[in-house]
Amino acid sequence: MDQFQTLSLLQMALNTNAIFTVATFFILWVAFRFAGKMREGESTMLGRVLITVFGLMIVWTGLLVGASRNLSFNAAASGLKAIKASGQTLSVQAEAFLTIPQISSATTTVQFSLFGDMPNVIFWLVVTVMLLSVIWMPVSAKKSS
């Protein structure tokens, strides 16, 4: 495979990842809407548990989407490094791609890692805490005027 094919496959993977990311954020918005509506009215334990499970499934999906994005970057970097090692000259853009810090540390053995991208993990951890707080924290008494 040459560098054009490698970068084209990366672009297709990133386009697919972007679609999944938008869908994940939409369904995350739905989960926060469910949690907010549940918080406004009477909530049952079953409702809280179901929304919690729904939210945790969304967080899991978000982690998978982030991990597949990193896998795509690492696979492309590994392919470009193999092309360069075979003696072919890479374009300026491909060389610039390989100088990105997260990319330059990619190994030749590409592995899927759910927790390989710490900013992604921290983001989804914060989202988890926020969602669980909306679901499980007690509602404060409203002040009457």
Language-model region placement:
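Membrane-interface interhelical loops and short amphipathic "cap" helices
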Residues: 1-14, 73-79, 83, 108
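C-terminal TM-helix exit segments that contain a strictly Trp-centered aromatic cap at the helix terminus
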Residues: 57-73
